[in-house]
Amino acid sequence: MFLFESIPWYSWLAWFGVLAALIIGNEITRRWKWAGTAIFIVLPIVLTIFVWPTTAGPDSSTGTWFHWVKVYSALAGCLGFMAIRYIPKLQTNRWALAFPPAILAINITEACIRDFQVGAMGVREMVDGVFMVSGPWNYMNGIAGLLNLLTICGWFGIFISRDKEQDMIWPDMLWFWIIAYDLWNFAYVYNCVGDHSFYAGAALLISCTIPAFFIKRGAWLQHRAHTLALWMMFTMAVPSFVTSSKFAVNASHNDAALMTVSAIALAANVAVALYQIYVIVRGRKNPLRDELYTDLEAYKSVREANI
């Protein structure tokens, strides 16, 4: 296969199982505050003390600085978003509303640094328990990630939905930016931890995109934080699932495949950046202060569905 080695039927079953588990886990933790508290506060404390020091140690494929930073930054996002959702004073505080784009930007920056780092290694071998192939694709995708970061916009328009779930709604974060993010992030995972990308790339990204498009529109970042935290906690506790279990699916490590996914990611993010520049210039808008896409039907429908 082009992107991956052979994918047996039981790995496809596991893939759909992971996808379903992440979507269900997200639904549980977003609907009930007690569930979010248990999963994103109590469970990580237990795992940090009793599990991860053994399962995600230096000899593990999840024992790198990136995985440790990623799990805690994802959890920080979950807790920060819960604070905004459940503490009324924060919902109108401009500094508090700057937290969601800040934590998102930090997560994107972490991945860009890692892509550039892998590119600079000049390797085609096992590194930190993961087979890596360095090449121009790392730099291409790092640039795509920076463009994705720079096109984050409209955060002062974040508000809390008026239903019982009290979701964090970001109307200006529309479908085209989300797709560009997904393409970039899949390329990142494929470039830097390719043998994890069947699950940590495809299944994980789809698990937050489906809710954002079909279950609770406008809450993509909340869905992303929840599913990422759930996946990172699991994979740091059971790294063998994606590396050596019967369900593991290895990447092809094909230069053409690496180049293709990064080129698509770069093209998508260039397109979003150019469109955003057009909107800013045409509407004379300030991307650091204004919501940019208020004229679009997609924006209006998200906002109207949650107020």
Predicted regions and their residues:
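Alpha-helical transmembrane segments
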Residues: 13, 39, 69-72, 95-102, ...
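Generic multipass alpha-helical transmembrane bundles of integral membrane proteins
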Residues: 91-218
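Membrane-interface segments at the starts/ends of alpha-helical transmembrane spans
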Residues: 58-64, 123-138, 249-261
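An N-terminal, globular interaction/scaffold subdomain
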Residues: 1-89
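C-terminal transmembrane-bundle signature of multipass membrane proteins
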Residues: 18-23, 200-306
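Hydrophobic cores of alpha-helical transmembrane segments in multi-pass inner/ER membrane proteins
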Residues: 12-22, 70-85, 141-157, 204-209, ...
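Hydrophobic alpha-helical transmembrane segments and adjacent interfacial helices
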Residues: 40-59, 78-86, 101-119, 175-191, ...
